């Protein structure tokens, strides 16, 4: 009879250094904890200083917080340079930070300023993060650049026109950078979530259980709720050596929603 194993649990990011933008809350905070649990030294980048500092204090000396507005190139430069100065290198850049519309509206009701605000953070912020991560990864001849996009890039109707444009830009960036940076051993991918309850989606005091129930009813995969750990685990896979030959890909985490049109099956009584 075999006794209990004394082997330490396998840590998928052992020895790696990661920056996670938008890491103080939501998907980013879950990714910070998961990457740290798997052996990475993590730099949390956010503008939510109290949340970011509290999370870094909770996780200990291998995690630190740096204030960073990702739409400000000087702050992104400081973020990357400080991470390398503190931990000696940068292996993973997870460009997760993003914002939503003020309201889910028609293009007829969307002011130009809302589109500019979303592109400035969601698209340009990701561009700057990737640019300066690549600056330090190219000499290393190795690295992983990740983004959080959205399932609204796979099927219409999940996001507003302005939000969808800002996330489509990320898909173009992923493909372009995968082509350019592959010669340096740098992989570039993104994760595209279906709707889920995060601090960003719950602004205004919306009950997270209500969001989960609503998204589940609209979703394709029944009996499961998408939570932040589902996206963080997808990012962990793409950041780890388990995906060492995966680049230029959009990992859609939506329970099959974007590939299903149930109209015909419903007409024939095959599904409810």
From Swiss-Prot:
Lineage, top-rank taxon, reads: Eukaryota
Q: What is this protein called?
A: (21S)-21-acetoxyl-apo-melianone synthase SDR
Question: Per its database record, what is this protein's job?
Answer: Oxidoreductase involved in the biosynthesis of limonoids triterpene natural products such as limonin, a compound with insecticidal activity responsible for the bitter taste in citrus. Catalyzes the oxidation of 21-O-acetyl-isomeliandiol to (21S)-21-acetoxyl-apo-melianone.
Q: Which tissues does it occur in?
A: Expressed in maturing fruits and in juice vesicles.
Q: Which species is the source of this protein? A: Citrus sinensis
In Gene Ontology terms, what is one molecular function of this protein? oxidoreductase activity
Q: Which family does it belong to?
A: Belongs to the short-chain dehydrogenases/reductases (SDR) family.
Question: Which pathway features in its UniProt record?
Answer: Secondary metabolite biosynthesis; terpenoid biosynthesis
Keyword Oxidoreductase (UniProt): yes
Keyword DNA damage attached: no
Reactions catalysed, semicolon-separated, are: 21-O-acetyl-isomeliandiol + A = (21S)-21-acetoxyl-apo-melianone + AH2
Q: What is its EC number?
A: 1.1.1.-
A matching Pfam family: adh_short_C2
Keyword terms, alphabetized = Oxidoreductase
- InterPro entries recorded for this chain? NAD(P)-bd_dom_sf (IPR036291), Sc_DH/Rdtase_CS (IPR020904), SDR_fam (IPR002347)
Q: Where is the active site?
A: 150, 163, 167
């Amino acid at each position: 009879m075999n006794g209990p194993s004394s082997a330490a649990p396998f840590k998928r990011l052992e020895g790696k250094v990661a920056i996670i933008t938008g890491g103080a809350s939501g998907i980013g905070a879950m990714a910070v904890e998961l990457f740290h649990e798997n052996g990475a030294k993590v730099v949390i980048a956010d503008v939510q200083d109290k949340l970011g500092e509290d999370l870094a204090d909770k996780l200990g000396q291998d995690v630190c917080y740096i204030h960073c507005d990702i739409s400000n190139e000087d702050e992104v430069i400081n973020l990357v340079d400080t991470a390398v100065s503190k931990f000696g290198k940068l292996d993973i850049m997870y460009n997760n930070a993003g914002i939503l519309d003020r309201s889910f509206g028609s293009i007829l009701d969307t002011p130009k300023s809302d589109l500019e605000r979303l592109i400035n953070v969601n698209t340009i912020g990701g561009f700057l993060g990737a640019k300066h991560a690549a600056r330090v990864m190219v000499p290393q001849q190795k690295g992983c650049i990740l983004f959080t996009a959205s399932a609204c890039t796979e099927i219409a109707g999940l996001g507003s026109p302005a939000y969808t444009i800002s996330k489509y830009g990320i898909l173009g960036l992923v493909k372009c950078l995968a082509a350019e940076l592959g010669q340096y051993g740098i992989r570039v991918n993104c994760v595209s979530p279906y709707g889920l309850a995060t601090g960003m989606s719950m602004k205004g005091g919306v009950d997270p259980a209500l969001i989960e129930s609503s998204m589940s009813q609209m979703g394709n995969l029944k009996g499961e709720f998408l939570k932040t750990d589902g996206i963080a685990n997808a990012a962990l896979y793409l950041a780890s050596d388990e995906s060492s030959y995966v680049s230029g890909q959009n990992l859609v985490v939506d329970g099959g929603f974007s590939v299903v049109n149930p109209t015909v099956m419903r007409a024939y009584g095959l599904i409810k």
